[in-house]
Every structure is written in C-alpha cells, then in structure tokens.
C-alpha cells in the first residue's frame, strides 16, 4: 500500500522525539511535516538524529500540515493543541492529540485546565485507550491520547471493576520518572532536587485524578470513588502504580487478569510484583494483583513516554488508518 503521510506539531519535546524514533521504524507511515514554535533543522534540536533524519522543522501552520499530511500528531501543551486540532479537522486531517484537551467532559476539563475552545470536537473525540475503545478508535478522526498516569492506573483497575466496592473506591499510589515533568526546566526537576530524593506532588489535586475517575466510572457504569497521589522518582523514565481496593466477592486476581487481557498483545500478566526495568523502552504494560482478607493490591508498570504517550499515539494512528495496531510498537526493554 502507498505510504501514509504523517506530521508532528510540537516535535521539540520528549514525546515528539519518541514519535520520531517510532515513525522511523514504521513500515507504512512517512514523516512529511515536523513543526515547533520556531524553525530549525531536526538535528539541531536533537543532535542524536544527525545522519539519521534530514528534515526541516517548520513554524507550526495547520494549513501547511494539512497539505502534506493525512494524520497529524499534536505533541503540544493543553489549550494550544485544541487550536490546531480544530483547524486540522476542518481540513480533513486525522488528529491524534497527546495533550489533555479532548480527554474529559467540558465541565471536568474547565475545572482542571481552562476554558475549552472546541466544544464541538470535544463531543466527538474518542479516548484513545486501545484496550477500552478499540472499535471506536477505528472509526475516529480525533483521538485523545490518554495521560501517562491514567494509562497505568486504568489498565490496572479496569479488570476488577465488577469485583470491588465502588463506594469505598480505589486508592492509587503512582510513581513516575522525571521525564514525566516534560522538557521545560523547573525547580522541582533540577538534578539536585531529584537526585537521591522521592516525593509526592499535587496529592489529591493532580489533574490526572479526574481523568482516571471519569473513565473508570464510565467503564463501570457507575460513579467510583478514587484517591490518587502521584510521586516523583529519581529515574529518567518509567511509571509504577500500586492500587488498593476492597473486594465484594472472593476472586483469584491472576485468573481475572489473565481472562480479561487474554487477547491483548501488549499487556503482560505477571505472577510477581512488576518492575519498571522490564517495560522501560517498550509499549508493554505489566500487571499483577494479589488478594488478602477481602482487599486487593494491583500493581502495574509502563514506560511513561511510550505506553503513556508516544507509542500509544502510534497504536491509535494505526487503528485510525486501518492498519495492524501493533505496527512499530517497541517490544524490547532498555534493561541496562
């Protein structure tokens, strides 16, 4: 089949780089447009791409992107992404948005972020967690790529929704590498702040809390109480979730996981506690769970930049274009 032309707007960040790395290995997608807030050569932004990719990075322009591309990945901050998405969609381009702009209801979005400027497309967007919405993604023109914490948390809890006390809810203790804070420098991401340190941040009030609750409640068909606390670890990449809930019936957790995810290529059910090392650099989500005295512990691990962002975006684009969803998804971990 002929190559499908794709573009990235917001290419200069970590997720932009990961998209490039994956697209270079994609058999059907051809990078035809790269854009950021200013013009440059791609190897000036990422010197590791010298001799690998010779493309100019343009100042972002939706009309120019639409001329060159059938699919555009938006790796932009919230609010900025929706401005481009609205234009691209009106020009017939499929959009995978890695920001938060289309993940929530209008009410929850405006509670956590800002006024929504594209309510019409917000109502049409499909939440791009493949294991949850595979068939809907196939027919979508706009996919909202899930956040990293919600990806790891929802995939962990989803199989157990009919077995846990929804009123008591679920407590989610999540930990991320520093790359989750993005490329822009802040006081909390300085080496001296992160090294030999670990801390909770934005406990209870993190923006991803409502994304997790919203999509778990939709999946359960009933409101579920959630308590979400993220932590920062002194590692570059990776994410670990520990979730706790009260059971309403006796189950064998590994059997539940195995049955629920039996057809999912990139979900690995483990019989021991999961490790970031085994998933870093891959699209895999490793999950395990243990029951004890009427309670359950669920443990998941992902790569926050890949399964939590860029490789998930590739999987969504694959489905949107009628391709094998697993094309170009990384499988070998960066173990050392």
Curated annotation (Swiss-Prot):
Assigned EC number: 1.2.1.38
Gene3D superfamilies associated with the record: Dihydrodipicolinate Reductase, domain 2, NAD(P)-binding Rossmann-like Domain
Residue positions of the active site: 148
GO molecular function: N-acetyl-gamma-glutamyl-phosphate reductase activity; NAD binding; NADP+ binding
SUPFAM superfamilies: Glyceraldehyde-3-phosphate dehydrogenase-like, C-terminal domain (SSF55347), NAD(P)-binding Rossmann-fold domains (SSF51735)
UniProt catalytic activity: N-acetyl-L-glutamate 5-semialdehyde + phosphate + NADP(+) = N-acetyl-L-glutamyl 5-phosphate + NADPH + H(+)
Pfam families in the cross-refs: Semialdhyde_dh, Semialdhyde_dhC_1
Main subcellular localisation: cytoplasm
Role played: Catalyzes the NADPH-dependent reduction of N-acetyl-5-glutamyl phosphate to yield N-acetyl-L-glutamate 5-semialdehyde.
The protein's name in its UniProt record: N-acetyl-gamma-glutamyl-phosphate reductase
Organism classification: Bacteria, Pseudomonadati, Campylobacterota, Epsilonproteobacteria, Campylobacterales
Gene responsible for this protein: argC
